[in-house]
Amino acid sequence: MGHYRCPNRAGSSDMVMTNTPPSGAMRGFGNENMSFCMEQLMDEAAEALGIDPIDIRLTNAKQVGDTAAMGLRLESTYMADCLKIGAAKFGWKERQGADRSQTGKVRRGYGLATMSHCTGAAPLYLEHSNAMVKFNEDGSVDLIVHPAPVGQHIWGALSQICAEELGIRAEDVHIIGDNTDVTLFEYGSDASRSTYAVGGATLRAARQAKAQLLSWAAEMLDVPVTDLFVKDRIVYFKNDPDKHIPISEVCFEAIYRFDGRATNFFGKQSFEPEWNSPTYGAYFAEVAVNTETGRVTVDRLVTVIDCGTPINPMAVEGQLEGAIQQEIGLALTENYLIKKETGVVETTNFDSYKVPTALDMPKIDIHIVDKPDPKGPFGAKGVGESGTVGVAPAIANAIYNAVGVRMRALPIPPERVLAALAEKNACKPDSEN
């Protein structure tokens, strides 16, 4: 319910002891399952009301100022943009009228789903990041941070954030992040928080270090500090472009001064948000369902993401493509089987636990809304888990559009599709079979 207005809700949970292996967190952390249920429910409600699935989502979408899923104020949302852009790119209006009375063994269907996923887990968890930025005598910078690099290209993003604020190149930023003896406290890389929280601390630390740099440069140039700016590793006087000084010269002068005023420019800052900026998205899927074998093939996916201003668009697309492949596996092939009598896992290798390969991937069109979040570093929000949330329900809704059966469990292997079709046909009058 994270992206829909729904004041009338309640929930309960039970703890049950089992003889099965313990479960733990993974990419998406339960949101995939909730979204699989919620987004099919939204389609069912739209069908019952006789309205377009897009319209029911737009009508009930949360707006800026509403309370986000974590209980904090929602700072930005462009879910409406995601839906409208996605519908245009996918050709939703043309495809939504697909004939349910298709003949032949292969039936085509089209479905959509929207999603939101947290950018950090405040206030449920400790949401605390720290960073230190230190200038070296050659004008390069040491960035001392400790996010967990789990494949999300976080060090690259942090280098870009730091470099952008300081007016230097990303390659001038040296990350020191693999030794807890010298780094500051860091909560960790989860809940799609690293770019947002660690990036927020990095940006604040860079601003603090830059203020010291500019103060020293103002003295060297004999101009007001408020009239200085940094670009391409040079400090400029805005009223006279010819009056400038390289960052390296300022840093060298400060470090190796012999009059008792020598110093090293650095900034050390923390980031602990008091707001929430979830990522939003819309997924549109085109599938083919073989009614004789039950096999579902995903032929095309259109993904539109509101992740604020992307720090590195290519890395964002890479994150989404990888997450989408994971989600296709969750939706169609990855079946974690446990023997009920013993609790022993039966799918112990990739010959039985089937993950999709590059050959199984559909054509994927990814579009980034690229509108800034007011609280994120340079407008960024998290995106690492967003691709794992909306794909499965979009596929399930497309299956329903193709053959008229609702899939209520994940994954959706051929045998479940055949069973659902058999149940549907058994309920028909003899004249329709």
Please state what every model-predicted region is.
Residues 1-81, 88, 97-433:
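Cofactor-binding beta-sheet edge motifs in enzyme active sites
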